Amino acid sequence: MVNARDTLISLPFSAASGPGVEWRITDSYVAYEDALAAMEARAAAIADGTAPELVWLLEHPPLYTSGTSAKASDLIEARFPVFPSGRGGQFTYHGPGQRVVYLMLDLKHRRPDVRAYVANLEELIITTLAAFNVRGERREDRVGVWVKRPDKGDGYEDKIAAIGVRLKRWVSMHGIAINVEPELSHFAGIVPCGIEDSRYGVTSLADLGLPVTMHDVDIALRQAFEQVFGEVHGVADQMAETTN
């Protein structure tokens, strides 16, 4: 069966023109409050035309974030700090071993279509996972990217990557989180994305038996980004940057 969102990625999502996309990788853990403030400031500058678009790859220390649809009952145990994020969605976990990708893209100059943007984020994840022979799939009734788990039983699937976005003046914020090798037990403090069905769990590349490094994922992400969203260039060729 063809997912309705599959049809949304058929049109180009690249920018018609502009100074290019900055590609930034931060090696140290970034406090959530600092990341949120930096995102807000950069998104405003992009909207004002004073800064290029930015794709920021990072890791957070262990924490939970709540989206605009989060229910208090889905916070089972606040094992780690909880932050309101302003993005769509419900509760999620971020922590070491998870590649968080914050995308600040000017959709006004790309394609001002929220549903198409989310579909392209899904495609970014699916293409990245394919580099490691992992078949990620989108689901019409569940946000994120999923992998089938026949080893767990008929109809079982695990989420391997989460998606949460916010738009302000048609500039995107937040983005995706791919589970490379996080501590999966940390997800037990919440009902991830409000999904209570026991057939649907959480997995990672390591959990699937793949010895993939964060650097491997970063290379695959950049290749996938250029395929889905267009070339990064200019200051984007700084493949690694450490910020404090």
Swiss-Prot record:
It is found in: Cytoplasm. Pathway: Protein modification; protein lipoylation via endogenous pathway; protein N(6)-(lipoyl)lysine from octanoyl-[acyl-carrier-protein]: step 1/2. It catalyses: octanoyl-[ACP] + L-lysyl-[protein] = N(6)-octanoyl-L-lysyl-[protein] + holo-[ACP] + H(+). It comes from Afipia carboxidovorans (strain ATCC 49405 / DSM 1227 / KCTC 32145 / OM5). This is Octanoyltransferase. GO terms for biological process: protein modification process. CDD domains: LipB. Keywords: Acyltransferase, Cytoplasm, Transferase. It comes from the Bacteria. Substrate binds at R87, G88, G89, Q90, F91, T92, Y93, H94, A162, I163, G164, G175, I176, A177. One of its GO terms (cellular component) is cytoplasm. Belongs to the LipB family. Its EC number is 2.3.1.181. InterPro entries: aa-tRNA-synth_II/BPL/LPL (IPR045864), BPL_LPL_catalytic (IPR004143), Octanoyltransferase (IPR000544), Octanoyltransferase_CS (IPR020605). In the reaction, the free carboxyl group of octanoic acid is attached via an amide linkage to the epsilon-amino group of a specific lysine residue of lipoyl domains of lipoate-dependent enzymes. The active site is at C193 (acyl-thioester intermediate).
